[in-house]
Amino acid sequence: MINPSEYQYEDSVWQDIYKCLKNADIEVYAPGIKTGECIHKYVVVKNDGASRHPEFSTDVELYAVMCYVPKQAYSTLEPFVREVQEVLLALRPMIKPTGVRTPSYYDDTYKAHMVSISYRNYKKVI
């Protein structure tokens, strides 16, 4: 868990998520950067939209953390997802899981199995 008074924030929550994963030696990309067949595990982080909180002057920003493993490494998908989730615990309370997680999906374009985990961040409306 981060200490808000000591944490060195980036310019955006997306950058904080990216940096946290990168610092844990997890290969991480922005959407559209990684191309070609998946030959080892990696993560893609994307901003997944936002909505206004119904009772407060707050926006709820969503982030998709997409975990990929090669097609022949399906058995490593769950351990990799858990590893990513454990690493991102360091960013609590800035981001929290929404409880939404996709079933595993085989993406023929990248020859990879993928699971997406959704995280949220509450941000005061300016």
Each model region followed by its residue ranges:
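A short, hydrophobic beta-strand-centered structural micro-motif
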Residues: I39-D48
